[in-house]
Design a protein with these regions (language model features):
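Conserved "HGTGT" condensation-loop signature of ketosynthase/thiolase-family condensing enzymes
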Residues: 1-135, 141-144, 152-300
Length: 300
């Protein structure tokens, strides 16, 4: 199995990037200093929202034209920030369904993954199964920041906070990304971070040099994965490339995992490397961590 990744749109703040995007196309974030927060932001909606769930629904309305790109018959996986209340998940899911094209002859297959930054990798096995459909599997990642919600104390931050929606199509083809079993774990009393379990598991699966590493930069999480890099000796070399995509995009949250896969796919498609072997780790502080190894499979 090898997955083709086709980015339909990447909406970050007020800007939407389409196929063939580069980071040079992304406009600089806006500096904001008001009664709510101080920092760089990329907002699609200028006002503060009552809650994160309410803001997600507002973003769905804002991006209605992009949801219309999904064929009525295509299966879809919806990736969301960590939302523990079932009713809140149901409200977001209903808002998405109202924007999607419908068919009287076909009921859409739709799965929801409200697991934050790890959502894409948690969903990856299901995405691969659905990618066999005639329309492929479509993936929507939607997220925002709680600093865009009223009722919080004023705070300052260094990371760029974003409203974001990523929409991509995946197809099971003879050429594309092939992936190892996804490793998943939660923060617990036994582990300071889910990464403390996921990284050793990935190290045990790694049997060849790593050409690329896609890793998060989130405070203590960075320290956690750094502590485990020696486990990958001798597979990490001076030629290994490190990808910290959020430095360009800002905090995408749920969309970060999908973006990592899109970046790796586009890189390999444009500049093929016969030895391509990549590691992707997505995690949230005190939340879920997920990791995977990719190879490039070609039918040629």
């Amino acid at each position: 199995m090898a997955l083709l990744f086709d980015s339909a749109c990447i909406a970050i703040g007020e800007q939407t990037l389409y196929q063939g995007f580069t980071w040079q196309d992304l406009e600089l974030p806006q500096w904001c200093d008001d009664i709510y927060f101080t920092g760089n932001v990329r907002r699609a909606i200028a006002h503060q929202s009552p809650s994160l769930v309410h803001r997600l629904i507002e973003l769905i309305d804002h991006h209605a034209v992009h949801f219309a790109l999904v064929p009525a018959e295509a299966p879809l996986c919806l990736l969301l920030p960590e939302i523990k209340e079932r009713q809140s998940v149901a409200e977001v899911l209903k808002a998405v369904q109202q924007k999607l094209p419908t068919s009287t002859e076909h009921e859409r297959t739709l799965f929801c993954y409200p697991y934050g930054s790890a959502s894409f990798l948690v969903a990856l096995k299901r995405i691969a199964q659905l990618a066999n459909s005639p329309y492929g599997c479509w993936v929507v990642a939607l997220d925002s920041s709680e600093v865009f919600c009223s009722g919080i104390e004023h705070q300052s931050f260094e990371e760029t906070k974003t409203d974001s929606l990523l929409l991509a199509r995946t197809v099971d083809t003879g050429t594309g990304l092939a992936f190892s079993p996804v490793q998943i774990d939660l923060h617990s009393q036994a582990y300071a971070s889910g990464s403390d379990s996921v990284m050793p598991s990935l190290a045990s699966l790694c049997k060849q040099e790593l050409t690329d590493l896609c890793l998060p930069l989130k405070g203590e999480e960075s320290e956690q994965w750094q502590n485990h890099l020696p486990r990958f000796s001798p597979w990490i070399t001076q030629q290994t490339r490190y990808h910290f995509n959020q430095l360009n995009s800002g905090e995408l949250g749920t969309g970060g995992g999908l973006l990592n896969a899109l970046v790796l796919y586009e890189q390999q498609k444009q500049a093929p490397n016969a030895h391509f072997h990549a590691l992707q780790l997505d995690c949230d502080p005190l939340g879920m961590a997920a990791g995977v190894l990719y190879r490039w499979r070609s039918e040629e």
